[in-house]
């Protein structure tokens, strides 16, 4: 997935972090990808890049979260990159669609938020650091969701009343609300092929 690694590097280098903490995480991600040609693959030991999306309701009042079957906690939609993913944005849109069951998601191709965390249930490795790149996905009016095999439950949560075990999502939700209120210079897309050719600015 060297082409995907190159795309991820280009996207992260072009992204303007909104805070010093996010800038430090971007440096960590870029350094990791520069040092590891397989840094986007789940087989990369120690750490690898993942992608996901926070799904915002059409009225911007709720976010769609999944109760992860292994972690038993509420998360945004996301997961590992796959060889067919043409970009980080395409991977995020694929994961969001697969895990939520929502058709017609519109994904902003510019990264929204970064978060690095250790995961104890990632395949054959006892502990792996996930370098997660999160995007904003907007659900259409009347969106219908479903529970995937990776989840116990999928549910809409008011943006002001997140689950108790998802307090760390607050920063990302706030970033999503701010992004949703600002006219975007990038075109949102519900087409993974289009997302793979979109460039963050």
Predicted features, each with a name:
Residues 182-201:
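Intrinsically disordered, low-complexity terminal tails and inter-domain linkers enriched
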Residues 61-102, 160:
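Conserved Nudix-box catalytic region and its N-terminal flanking loop in Nudix hydrolases
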Residues 134, 145-176:
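NUDIX/MutT-family hydrolases
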Residues 101-143:
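Active-site segment of metal-dependent pyrophosphate-handling enzymes
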Residues 16-52:
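Acidic, metal-coordinating catalytic segment for phosphate/diphosphate chemistry
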Residues 1-28, 100:
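Predominantly extracellular/luminal regions of secreted and cell-surface proteins
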């Amino acid at each position: 997935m060297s082409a995907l690694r190159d795309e991820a590097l280009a996207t992260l280098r072009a992204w303007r972090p909104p805070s010093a903490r996010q800038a430090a995480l971007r440096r960590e991600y870029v350094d990791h990808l520069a040092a590891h040609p397989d840094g986007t693959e789940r087989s990369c030991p120690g750490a690898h890049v993942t992608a996901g999306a926070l799904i915002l309701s059409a009225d911007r009042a709720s976010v769609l979260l999944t109760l992860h079957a292994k972690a038993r906690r509420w998360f945004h939609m996301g997961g590992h990159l796959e060889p067919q993913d043409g970009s980080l944005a395409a991977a995020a849109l694929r994961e969001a669609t697969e895990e939520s069951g929502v058709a017609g998601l519109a994904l902003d191709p510019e990264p929204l938020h970064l978060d690095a965390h250790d995961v104890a249930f990632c395949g054959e490795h006892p502990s792996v650091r996930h370098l997660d790149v999160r995007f904003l996905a907007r659900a259409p009016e009347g969106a219908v969701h479903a529970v995937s095999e990776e989840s116990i439950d999928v549910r809409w949560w008011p943006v002001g009343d997140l689950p108790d075990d998802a307090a760390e999502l607050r920063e990302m939700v706030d970033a999503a609300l701010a992004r949703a209120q600002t006219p975007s210079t990038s075109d949102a897309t519900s087409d993974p092929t289009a997302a793979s050719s979109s460039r963050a600015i």
